[in-house]
């Protein structure tokens, strides 16, 4: 089983395995390339995002800088807006619905360190090298959500549709769909 398969099964994985390191380096290079491209060069920026992300909807606007851990584990819906310093540690899958807006400095995190002391210590992997292991839990964000500045979304969180997350919030658990005024 590959380390990436372990991630998606919710098992401990070694984030420094060569297969994962190369995917992260690719994402970091593409994130940097995006950040070095001017906002008025929309076609180039969109092409970079399409290469970087697992899925990218239509009409997405991301102001730089952006940072993605893997990129390929992130799916972004249609007509989303991400303000400055949008950071996604997408070890596990991150799914963002349509018409979502993110204020500056929003961070979405999927990796988490083990809670048990024995698991936090370095473990010898199949190749005989001692590595530190971690888990990752997916994050799912429904359609029509709005995130204020400096929001942190923690591993394993599901946010329903039409939710408003106030500035400075740390989201640690399920947020149910909020009724829409159109309903």
Which functions belong to the PLM regions below?
Residues 66-76, 81-158:
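Flexible, glycine/small-residue-enriched loop-and-beta-strand segment within the central core
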């Amino acid at each position: 089983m590959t380390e990436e398969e372990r991630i998606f099964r919710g098992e401990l994985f070694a984030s420094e395995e060569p297969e994962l390191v190369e995917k992260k380096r690719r994402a970091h290079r593409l994130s940097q390339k995006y950040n070095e491209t001017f906002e008025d060069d929309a076609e180039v920026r969109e092409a970079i995002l399409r290469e970087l992300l697992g899925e990218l909807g239509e009409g997405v606007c991301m102001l730089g800088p952006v940072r993605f851990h893997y990129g390929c584990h992130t799916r972004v819906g249609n007509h989303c807006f991400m303000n400055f310093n949008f950071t996604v540690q997408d070890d596990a899958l991150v799914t963002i619905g349509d018409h979502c807006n993110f204020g500056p400095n929003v961070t979405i995190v999927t990796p988490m360190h083990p809670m048990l002391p024995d698991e936090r210590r370095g473990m010898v992997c199949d190749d005989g090298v001692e590595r530190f292991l971690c888990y990752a839990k997916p994050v799912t964000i429904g359609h029509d959500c709005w995130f204020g500045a400096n929001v942190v979304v923690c591993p394993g969180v599901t946010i329903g549709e039409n939710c408003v997350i106030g500035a400075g919030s740390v989201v640690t658990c399920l947020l149910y769909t909020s009724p829409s005024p159109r309903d």
